[in-house]
Amino acid sequence: MDTPFSTLIRTASHEQHTEAETSTFMGDLLGGRLGVDAYARYTEQLWFVYRALEDAAKPLADDPVAGPFIQPELLRVPELERDLAHLRGPDWRETVSALPQTRAYAERVAECAASWPGGYVAHHYTRYLGDLSGGQIIRDKAEKTWGFARKGDGVRFYVFEGVSNPAAFKRHYRELLDAIAVDDLEKQRVVAECKAAFALNTGVFRGLGEEFRSAA
């Protein structure tokens, strides 16, 4: 395979990535047409997905395929829990709920984590590299729209304090992708799972869009 895997995976999933980024729900959220409750509900959905991702971090830490990607500075569940406590109050665990689309997403992540390290890498890539990039746009909009303190409670999910140079970190991550210890056929399967991951994420946005109809 002559094309670097990081390039292949980015190119192959471009269409699904664009569809996820341009969902009606996200457009309404970033456009200020939805209230803070919609933002909190989205944060709840993220918690379910990231819990599935990060519950697998320790078991997969020594795996030759997935292990190199598991880095403590990426972990988001503790930050999501701080955000949810701020958004929903100290008893947020009693009211938090997953949309059917979110359950399907989290279940697929857990399934890959349990039986297919390459598939886990696909989900890891689609989430964390997106958070380091487009997530910063969401943080900025949330701070301005709902008055959260800059990089404070409510938007901590988007703050990677352990990543001092995001551009360098993403470059290193792509180097890890290029060096992934799988053959070309497995790489094709990983690319297909990336597409599936974006589709699952788009499904979550669709579910949220049905729950929160824009007033626009």
Predicted region positions:
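Metal- and O2-centered redox machinery and metal/ROS homeostasis
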Residues: 1-216
